[in-house]
């Protein structure tokens, strides 16, 4: 009996290794075909990391050298940062610092006179759900038209928020109007009730409470030996950390970098909550984060496919791509991070997603 169990264990281990090797080969093939220098991916359940791997090179210029990818390499999350900002907002609601229906101008009455009256009733939840009508600020052209703001990051974001609230709102019949800028205004509310900057809140929750590593901004701005982002100019090239590219005004919407190990842990906390388990947040808070609105909840876009509810998000600053898909019905998550922000790389990412889901259904 013992021999049979040992034989079964060896067979099972062999099958797992074979599946991992197979998916690694397919990842390498996709990366070559779609010019992706480095990729990290994971499949996660509430109680298990099914697979997790990082492969490739930090820079396209190193592509003919020995691979230097490391499992702890950081990737820029882009707009997948929104789920982290939403998570922190959820944490503040549980600390009784703020409520989802808190109105912005009840916290900042001094800004009301100079703001557009159509914004008078906007709430924290509406800002995080893209239902407050805030202008999008999803393109560089919008930022180039801004006046010059003075001070540190927090002061500049506050001035940015004041400016945003003077603009006409986005008004149409869409279920939501995606806005990076709306998250900057939401962050201002979170800062007001906590007495801390958004940056301090991220450190409190991610680093101090959850023991997760992260960086703000591009990985290579913290360490040159981390992955570099890539864009086409017109050929694919790595983007130097000294490049004039500043996302600080919309940092709460899209400027955190994490490695696949710690980002997977963060996603796993969300899966546990969706499975009904309390952790740093209560299960009911996770339900609100994911399901408080049909089309776009708090940091997550929602869709129903074949009677299964999915939440997903794609993040990019134009140099990296980050994608996470969560099957709420199981729940299970698929995560793919790459250091190329081109449309071609995005096609490769979604092609690999199909392969990953087929290998680990």
Regions found by a protein language model. Give the residues of each.
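Short, conserved catalytic-motif segment at the N-terminal edge
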Residues: 21-75, 97-99, 165
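Short, gly/Ser/Thr-rich active-site loops of penicillin-recognizing serine hydrolases
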Residues: 305-309, 340-361
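Short, surface-exposed loop or secondary-structure junction motifs
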Residues: 57, 116-318
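Active-site SXXK
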Residues: 24-27, 41, 47, 76-104, ...
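Bacterial Sec-dependent N-terminal signal peptides
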Residues: 1-23
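Catalytic tyrosine of NAD(P)H-dependent dehydrogenase/reductases that use a Tyr as the general acid/base
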Residues: 75-78, 176-178
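Short, well-ordered beta-strand elements
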Residues: 312, 322-340
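Short, glycine/proline-biased beta-turn/loop segments that scaffold the active-site neighborhood
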Residues: 99-115, 209-210
């Amino acid at each position: 009996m013992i021999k049979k169990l040992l034989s079964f264990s060896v067979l099972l281990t062999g099958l797992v290794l074979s599946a991992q090797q197979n998916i690694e080969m397919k990842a390498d093939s996709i990366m070559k075909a779609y010019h992706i220098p480095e990729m990290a991916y994971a499949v996660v359940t509430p109680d298990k990391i099914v697979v997790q791997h990082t492969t490739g090179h930090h820079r396209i210029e190193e592509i003919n050298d020995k691979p230097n990818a490391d499992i702890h390499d950081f990737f820029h999350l882009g707009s997948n940062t929104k789920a982290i900002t939403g998570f922190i907002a959820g944490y503040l609601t549980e600390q009784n610092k703020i409520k989802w229906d808190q109105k912005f101008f009840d916290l900042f009455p001094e800004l009301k006179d100079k703001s557009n009256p159509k914004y008078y009733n906007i709430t924290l939840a509406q800002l995080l759900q893209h239902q407050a009508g805030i202008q999008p600020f999803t393109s560089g052209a919008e930022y180039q038209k801004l006046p010059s703001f003075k001070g540190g990051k927090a002061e500049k974001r506050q001035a940015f928020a004041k400016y945003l609230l003077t603009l006409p709102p986005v008004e149409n019949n869409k279920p939501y109007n995606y806005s990076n800028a709306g998250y900057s205004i939401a962050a201002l509310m979170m800062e007001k009730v906590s007495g801390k900057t958004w940056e301090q809140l991220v450190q409190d929750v991610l680093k101090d409470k959850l023991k997760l590593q992260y960086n703000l901004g591009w990985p290579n701005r913290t360490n040159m030996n981390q992955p570099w982002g890539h864009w086409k100019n017109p050929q694919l090239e790595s983007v130097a950390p000294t490049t004039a590219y500043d996302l600080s005004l919309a940092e709460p919407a899209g400027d955190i970098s994490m490695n696949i190990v710690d980002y997977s842990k963060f996603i796993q906390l969300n899966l546990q909550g969706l499975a009904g388990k309390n952790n740093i947040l209560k299960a009911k808070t996770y339900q609100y984060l994911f399901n408080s609105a049909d089309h776009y909840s708090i940091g997550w876009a929602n869709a129903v496919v074949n009677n299964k509810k999915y939440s997903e998000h794609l993040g990019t600053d134009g140099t990296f791509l980050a994608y996470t898909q969560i099957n709420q019905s199981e729940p299970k998550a698929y995560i793919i991070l790459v250091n190329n922000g081109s449309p071609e790389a995005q096609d490769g990412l979604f092609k690999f997603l199909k392969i990953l889901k087929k290998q680990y259904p």
